[in-house]
Amino acid sequence: MNRKGTGFSLSVSIIMGAFLAAGTAIAKDPDPSRLLISRNAEFNKEILRVSDNVYTAVGYAVSPVSMIVGPQGIVIVDAGLDVASSREIRADFRRIVDKPVKAIIFTHGHPDHTHGASAFMDSTDVQVWAREGFPHEQHALETAGILIQKKRGKKQAGFALSPKHRINNGIAKAFWPSRKGGIFSADHKVNPTHIFNSERQKLSVAGLDLELVAATGETDDGLYIWFPAEHVVFAGDNFYKSWPNLYALRGTPYRDIRGWANVIGMIMQEDAVALVGGHTRPIIGKREVNQTLANYRDAILFLFDKTVEGINKGMTPNQLVDYVVLPEKYKNLDYLRPYYGNPEWAIRAIFSGYLGWFDGNATNLFPLSDAQEAQRIVKLAGSEDALADLIVGAINEKDYQWAAMLCDYLLVVDPKNKTVMLRKADALTALAQDKLTTTARNYYLSSAIELRKQASALASE
């Protein structure tokens, strides 16, 4: 293995478990921005040696890319966000070992794990493995003709924001698309050449024996990879160091939350000594891996079971988010902090995923339209001017959620009210600063930018 003259950071010895262990409980920090800034250390750009023959590149793009070295070549696990960053990873992998890529394995079909694949196509004989249904999420929405998730996805990711307003993305550095073709555009799309449709598929390639395991969690096409010779598991997006994204703001089909927790239990049964997640740094050491996965699984199951308990008591989604409170032992674990996903969204997703839109309150069988409700709120306030005064009062009292809601009423009855647009933008900006969940921050701030642009356009008419 040639490590001379490399321009990248390589941990030449196996990562110490104490360094990467994610099981450290930390005190609750009232300053989300400070927590996110300290989080940046998780995304330092380097190649980590996970075991004797496993290397993981972190910090190059949104998701890690791993290399398993075999006697006859290498296997790539996930291919990164884009061809440019993946080419850099390929070059740095080649400095470690100059062997041909024999296979690429996609843990699921999200673009940040697949769109860099052409950088690893050393020949036309490279096997590209994925699970049946790949990529399920995109197919389900596109088949229905639903496109709005693309616009919402840009807000969730914060692509319209400046570096000043994106500290990171919770589970990755803040990246922006390098091409105008769309979110996570691929220069050369690489499709799977091999699909497996069983619960567990044994794969012999490059002189390596691997096992691909069906693992429906974040996506229906998800899988994890078990490398028994070195007891390494590659979990894909079913694990990363954050409260999991059990519901994505861009809009997705229901993610089987109980099934997700069960997959974590399956991964635990492998008894791995190293865990490579779909984002963030690997976890090394049997004890650390088992403890982390157990807490991850148990926290998800607690939330699911408590939500079902509340549902069976007749609670509405709004009532459930007050009823379901995670125990402190989970809330204070850094790898369960809501950097990316948020427990409240998961609670609402469970309700709608099983019971649909109707919350059980007869009043809501045929609710007022937005216009009808807004007109009545204005009447209740006394006038549009009186409602505008209430908005100012709410902002002055730092009641930003209420201020934004009041703005919505007034914008329904007066959709070109520039002043209210700007006040809602201010309220959303303030809400963003108070949230740790990066996807929420991004969505708030992106929406605020839209409102300010709309107000500016109206002012110039």
Enumerate the language-model features and the residues they cover.
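Divalent metal-coordination and catalytic microenvironments
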Residues: 53, 68, 78, 93, ...
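Metallo-beta-lactamase
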Residues: 28-34, 49, 73-75, 81-83, 137-214, 259-271, ...
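Bacterial N-terminal signal peptides that target proteins for export
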Residues: 1-13
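Active-site metal-binding motif and surrounding structural segment of the metallo-beta-lactamase
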Residues: 42, 71-73, 84-130, 197
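Bacterial N-terminal signal peptides
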Residues: 11-21
